[in-house]
Amino acid sequence: MKTQQSFHVVAGFVCFPMSKTSQSRCYSTLRDFLIPPSKQKFVPSSGTYPKGFLAAGAHAGVKESNTQFRDVALICSKTPCSAAAVFTTNKFQAAPVQVSKQVLEAREGADITGVVINSGCANAVTGKGGLEDAKSMSAKVDECNGTPSTSSKGPSTLVMSTGVIGRRLPIKRILNAIPVAHSNLSSTHKAWLNAARSICTTDTFPKLLSRTFTLPSSPNHTYRIAGMTKGAGMIHPNMATLLGILCTDVPISPAALKPLLSHAVSRSFNCISIDGDTSTNDTVALLANGAAGGQTITTPSSPNYAAMQTVLTSFAQSLAQLVVRDGEGATKFVTVRVLNSPSQADARAIASTIARSPLVKTALYGRDANWGRILCAIGYTQGIQVGTVVPERTSVSFKPVDGSEELKLLVNGEPQMVNEERAARILQDEDLEIVVDLGGGEKGGEGMAGEEGIYWFCDFSHEYVTINADYRT
């Protein structure tokens, strides 16, 4: 007898029941957005978006196999913005990365009007023709905005692309889609969600967040921040690790915006890893149009700077964690926290090494409390100070999400009697925290706390191999 499946819609996307291990992946062909049940909770049903910003998505057919689904997104501001961005360190920087850098440099981070993004083709390693394609995308948006790129400062729109490397864009189709997207620009939640959906590739759900907050100088004044990201594979920091667009209506000068973003990225997008690969296209951009009014943040010494830094960093961390939760084939969201290190740099290096380890990631997928693999990763971490890792001081434990007592695996270099049944129960949960205590945090013998490093990562499953083996086919 056939069982009847119930289909429903979350925020305009089809959702359906699936097996625990199965996930809907677009691979290299965009298709209807089937959101796995376990991911539906991450898709917002509403939002509060920054004043003066508009969003939209449109269909261009960047991939010939995509005959109807949106693959071009626009984020525009009604008034010029301050803007800053952090880019990939990959030597093969994609054309949109190079063009966006040029736009920001020519305009000194001021008078930026928006961002245009396409999915389905990375426009990376495409030579001079690829650069011209990226420039034409920026110019087309400027034309639609009524701000021609013929000004002495050049174009005012940033460009991002994601997808397969080494192929030219179907630029005519994209240039035809940009005016369509522009005509659909809106401040509604649906418009923002459509834009977030348009930039997805192997993502199983659109990653969109929005928040309201206040600042010390105007405690009764409401400000807003919104952001979207895409990314599920080729994720490892060196920044930025993916595509991210953040917008706020707080008035912030270009001089203050760049350090705000750099600090936030270093503690969010640069603290995640899915597979250890750094893309050619990684970009995270922050736009601030000041539409909400109030006192302008001009320097790090401005009254609202510290509070804005806290808001932005927390928001960026939430966005970055969504990327990990949608890691290709992932079944686990893992936090690794390294405590009592002589320096934060060493703590982060160790956390990063654990997060990248294929042996750690596969053990977690197999629900195997194989702490020896964690110790191995700690021990071969490169670039840390002599004496940071002392086996006789090192402790490792699993911290359950239910708040129960930590499961101690290693204490001061001594292996513990591990209750394997409890370990298996802990590893059944989607979320897990690994705590590494280096026991070397005392400074000057005064018992002061040492430095901490944190990373978020996911496991490796059979599906990760399937997705990436089939990516171009």
Curated annotation (Swiss-Prot):
Record's keyword annotation contains Acyltransferase: yes
Transferase as UniProt keyword: yes
Post-translation changes: The alpha and beta chains are autoproteolytically processed from a single precursor protein within the mitochondrion.
Reactions mediated catalytically: N(2)-acetyl-L-ornithine + L-glutamate = N-acetyl-L-glutamate + L-ornithine; L-glutamate + acetyl-CoA = N-acetyl-L-glutamate + CoA + H(+)
Primary localization class, coarse: mitochondrion
EC number: 2.3.1.35, 2.3.1.1
Gene Ontology molecular function: glutamate N-acetyltransferase activity; L-glutamate N-acetyltransferase activity
SUPFAM superfamilies the record matches: DmpA/ArgJ-like
Entry GO terms, CC: mitochondrial matrix
Entries under Gene3D superfamilies matching the protein: arginine biosynthesis bifunctional protein suprefamily, ArgJ beta chain, C-terminal domain, L-amino peptidase D-ALA esterase/amidase
Subcellular localization(s) per the UniProt record: Mitochondrion matrix
Pathway annotation: Amino-acid biosynthesis; L-arginine biosynthesis; L-ornithine and N-acetyl-L-glutamate from L-glutamate and N(2)-acetyl-L-ornithine (cyclic): step 1/1; Amino-acid biosynthesis; L-arginine biosynthesis; N(2)-acetyl-L-ornithine from L-glutamate: step 1/4
Site (Involved in the stabilization of negative charge on the oxyanion by the formation of the oxyanion hole): T162, G163
Active-site residues, as the UniProt record annotates them: T241
GO terms classed as biological process: L-arginine biosynthetic process; ornithine biosynthetic process
Keywords, comma-separated and alphabetical: Acyltransferase, Amino-acid biosynthesis, Arginine biosynthesis, Autocatalytic cleavage, Mitochondrion, Multifunctional enzyme, Transferase
Enzyme class at the top of the EC tree: transferase
Residues engaged in binding substrate: T201, K230, T241, E328, N468, T473
Classification via InterPro entries: Arg_biosynth_ArgJ (IPR002813), ArgJ-like_dom_sf (IPR016117), ArgJ_beta_C (IPR042195)
Described function: Catalyzes two activities which are involved in the cyclic version of arginine biosynthesis: the synthesis of acetylglutamate from glutamate and acetyl-CoA, and of ornithine by transacetylation between acetylornithine and glutamate.
Self-association state and partner proteins as the record states: Heterodimer of an alpha and a beta chain.
Name the record gives this protein: Arginine biosynthesis bifunctional protein ArgJ, mitochondrial
High-level lineage: Eukaryota, Fungi, Dikarya, Ascomycota, Pezizomycotina
